[in-house]
């Protein structure tokens, strides 16, 4: 039980540290880009 608690606590501390210091990719922007790409592929070229 003690080993589990130590591992759990250490994991949380490391996770919080990484979350604060690691620049997360902007998922909302990525989704918008993917949507635009899909819409562009669906539309036939108007030439």
Swiss-Prot record:
Q: Does the keyword Amino-acid biosynthesis apply?
A: no
Q: Which Pfam families match?
A: DUF4535
InterPro entries linked:
STMP1
**What changes when the gene is disrupted?**
Mice were born at expected Mendelian ratios and do not show any visible phenotype, displaying normal heart function and cardiac dimensions. Cells however display defects in complex III activity and metabolic perturbations in the heart, as well as altered complex III assembly into respiratory supercomplexes.
Q: Under the cellular component aspect of Gene Ontology, which terms does the record hold?
A: mitochondrial inner membrane; mitochondrial intermembrane space; mitochondrial outer membrane
Found, by tissue, as follows: Widely expressed, with highest levels in lung, skeletal muscle and heart. Expressed in bone marrow-derived macrophages (at protein level).
Instruction: Tell me what topology the record assigns in the membrane.
Output: Single-pass membrane protein
Is Mitochondrion one of the keywords? yes
Q: Name one GO biological process term.
A: innate immune response
Q: What induces it?
A: Down-regulated by TLR ligands, including bacterial lipopolysaccharide (LPS), in bone marrow-derived macrophages.
Q: Which UniProt keywords apply?
A: Immunity, Innate immunity, Membrane, Mitochondrion, Mitochondrion inner membrane, Mitochondrion outer membrane, Transmembrane, Transmembrane helix
As for subcellular location, the record says:
Mitochondrion inner membrane; Mitochondrion outer membrane; Mitochondrion intermembrane space
| Spans traversing the lipid bilayer | 7-23
- Identify the domain of life: Eukaryota
Q: Which family does it belong to?
A: Belongs to the STMP1 family.
Subunit details: Interacts with components of the ubiquinol-cytochrome c oxidoreductase (cytochrome b-c1 complex, complex III, CIII), such as UQCRC1/QCR1, UQCRC2/QCR2 and UQCR10/QCR9. Interacts with components of the cytochrome c oxidase (mitochondrial respiratory chain complex IV) complex, such as MT-CO2.
- PANTHER family attached here? SHORT TRANSMEMBRANE MITOCHONDRIAL PROTEIN 1 (PTHR47709:SF2)
Q: What does this protein do?
A: Microprotein involved in mitochondrial respiratory chain complex III (ubiquinol-cytochrome c oxidoreductase) and complex IV (mitochondrial cytochrome c oxidase complex) assembly. Required for the formation of mitochondrial supercomplexes (SCs). Also required for the activation of the NLRP3 inflammasome.
Please give the name of this protein.
Short transmembrane mitochondrial protein 1
Q: Look up and give the organism this protein is from.
A: Mus musculus (Mouse)
Origin organism lineage: Eukaryota, Metazoa, Chordata, Craniata, Vertebrata
**Its gene?**
Stmp1
């Amino acid at each position: 039980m003690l080993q589990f608690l130590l591992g759990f606590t250490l994991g949380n501390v490391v996770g919080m540290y990484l979350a604060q210091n690691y620049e997360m990719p902007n998922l909302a922007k990525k989704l918008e880009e993917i949507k635009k790409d899909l819409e562009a592929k669906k539309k036939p070229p108007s030439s």
